[in-house]
């Protein structure tokens, strides 16, 4: 089943063309790898898929609804694109609970299970400011998956992780794929793209 349709997508900033005639049909239960040089437009494309920016022309449809026409944002999406907006003096659990309160349909148990899936302890009383970069990345993954979204859009999901963390996140993504999620990843780690992707796109 098609989850995402990208139809002749263009994005220009001033005279610079960032995205040029991007087309793709992305199905549920698959992982799609996007790769290319720095500045090629991967992050811009992901921001467009999440409804964070409006394309210059073309369409993005999520479950048949056109972004910026039928709706502004995808209904069920987990995202890692930029530095997450975590509160420095909240614990990991407190951060996710605060973010979950916006949607009001994620239980404390779901939050705890998401934190445990990424190898963290929901009872850890350390505040976010004291997390290492790797722990911050793990918490960002926990945030992305805690709602069990239909769509995961992940820019550099294994960034800052050690070997154990990389393997853990790869396994989580495969589990999310099995659950039926549509997963978009962009990575400079060639192994991420090669090992995880059902289909690859050069941007």
Predicted segments — roles?
Residues 50:
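Helix-to-loop junction immediately C-terminal to a conserved catalytic motif
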Residues 141:
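Hydrophobic anchor residue at the start of the ABC signature
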Residues 58-73:
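Conserved ABC transporter NBD signature motif
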Residues 97, 108-124:
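Conserved ABC ATPase "signature" region
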Residues 152-156:
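Catalytic Walker B motif of ABC-type/P-loop ATPase nucleotide-binding domains
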Residues 35-37:
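The feature captures the beta-strand-to-loop junction immediately N-terminal to the Walker
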């Amino acid at each position: 089943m098609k989850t995402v349709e990208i139809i002749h997508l263009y994005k220009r900033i001033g005279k610079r063309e960032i995205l040029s005639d991007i087309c793709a049909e992305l199905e549920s239960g698959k992982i799609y790898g996007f790769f290319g040089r720095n500045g090629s437009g991967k992050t811009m494309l992901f921001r467009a898929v999440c409804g964070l920016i409006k394309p210059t022309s073309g369409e993005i449809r999520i479950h048949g609804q056109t972004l910026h026409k039928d709706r502004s944002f995808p209904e069920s999406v987990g995202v890692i694109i930029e530095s997450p907006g975590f509160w420095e003096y909240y614990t990991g659990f407190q951060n996710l609970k605060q973010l979950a309160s916006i949607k009001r349909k994620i239980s404390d148990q779901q939050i705890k299970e998401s934190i445990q899936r990424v190898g963290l302890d929901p009872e850890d009383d350390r505040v976010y400011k004291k997390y290492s970069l790797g722990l911050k990345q793990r918490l960002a993954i926990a945030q992305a998956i805690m709602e069990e979204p239909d769509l995961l859009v992940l820019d550099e999901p294994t960034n800052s992780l050690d070997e154990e963390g990389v393997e853990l996140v790869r396994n989580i993504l495969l589990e999310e794929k099995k659950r039926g999620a549509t997963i978009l990843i962009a990575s400079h780690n060639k192994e991420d793209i090669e090992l995880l992707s059902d289909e690859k796109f050069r941007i």
